[in-house]
UniProtKB/Swiss-Prot annotation:
Protein residues bound to heme b b566: H97, H196
Keywords: Electron transport, Heme, Iron, Membrane, Metal-binding, Mitochondrion, Mitochondrion inner membrane, Respiratory chain, Transmembrane, Transmembrane helix, Transport, Ubiquinone
Organism: Galerella pulverulenta (Cape grey mongoose)
PANTHER family found in the cross-reference section: CYTOCHROME B
One Gene Ontology term, aspect cellular component: respiratory chain complex III
Membrane topology value: Multi-pass membrane protein
Cited Gene3D superfamilies: Cytochrome Bc1 Complex, Chain C
Protein name as annotated: Cytochrome b
Binding-site residues, heme b b562: H83, H182
Binding site for a ubiquinone: H201
InterPro entries for this protein: Cyt_b/b6_C, Cyt_b/b6_C_sf, Cyt_b/b6_N, Cytb/b6-like_sf, Cytochrome_b, Cytochrome_b_C_euk/bac, Cytochrome_b_N_euk/bac, Di-haem_cyt_TM
Family matches, as CDD domains: cytochrome_b_C, Cytochrome_b_N
Positions of transmembrane segments: 33-53, 77-98, 113-133, 178-198, 226-246, 288-308, 320-340, 347-367
GO molecular-function term, one example from the UniProt record: ubiquinol-cytochrome-c reductase activity
Amino acid sequence: MTNIRKSHPLIKIVNESFIDLPAPSNISAWWNFGSLLGVCLILQILTGLFLAMHYTSDTATAFSSVTHICRDVNHGWMIRYMHANGASMFFICLFMHVGRGMYYGSYTFMETWNIGILLLFTVMATAFMGYVLPWGQMSFWGATVITNLLSAIPYIGTNLVEWIWGGFSVDKATLTRFFAFHFILPFIICALAAVHLLFLHETGSNNPSGISSDSDKIPFHPYYTIKDILGLLIMLMMLMTLVLFSPDLLGDPDNYTPANPLNTPPHIKPEWYFLFAYAILRSIPNKLGGVLALVLSIMILAIVPLLHTSNQRGMMFRPLSQCLFWLLVADLLILTWIGGQPVEYPFIAIGQLASILYFLIILIFMPISGTIENQLLKW
């Protein structure tokens, strides 16, 4: 009799994806983030489900319902902060995962990469709408500012914004629909993640050397299951340290003030994981130009595979490209810092320089360095 693991129609799929999957023998800890993202997603769906049981998506009661969760619901404070800080962990893992893909040339798996970009956009949309739900000052004004960006679209912009708002300002209708979307999107993310894995398993994983590992594969279980569990424990330890010791470290104090359309906060800024894109948006004085730069700052990932000029897949043996990659990382950190600063000298100039450098590195410097390295190998 054959093993049920290999014969049962449903269990067979799980077996071929997580147990008997042939994996490269040399993938490093940078390959842990895929599974960590899966865990983050499950954690967010579960904590979100329990929060939704007590939350009311009405402008009159949303803020007090979140307060009620924190004060009166059993372990409500912990569920709320696990959800809020879980989003931060989600984005840390996302950035690491995308960075790994760029460093090791995983973007040559075009379908997997493009589904990944779609996932990134969907997660960003979900996080943005989730930030609006507590209905604090920064929730309200963040929603107003970001949705207002769509009014920069010629001809249909204003109508589009009012259609999304469900009125002439961010109000009850906006909050209700944002809650509905925030609830449904994680399940769409689940479906996209399954497609992402499907495409990945068509080709098999990349590895640090960038060379085909078909001749040297090991089973996913037990080798990488145990390795993933280590990564998971480290991540959960970091998350729970944040939740139990300084849950508001990454939040904005303004969000503890109920939303007031008559009083604008001095500095409107999104959560930390959007600050790099926000800095790029603000660095362009023109509204439409800023919106285009904002979208392009993420969409640029879609053309990264087309800009690959090197004969080698990854950057493991390409010191020049490595320098540029880490320059890009430093540049993104500077943009993140600038996004949280007021719009005044010298922050405006720093933000503009960092934004220009961001696009220059990806569009011009990296393809040139690939070509130079090809020439150096010939000599």
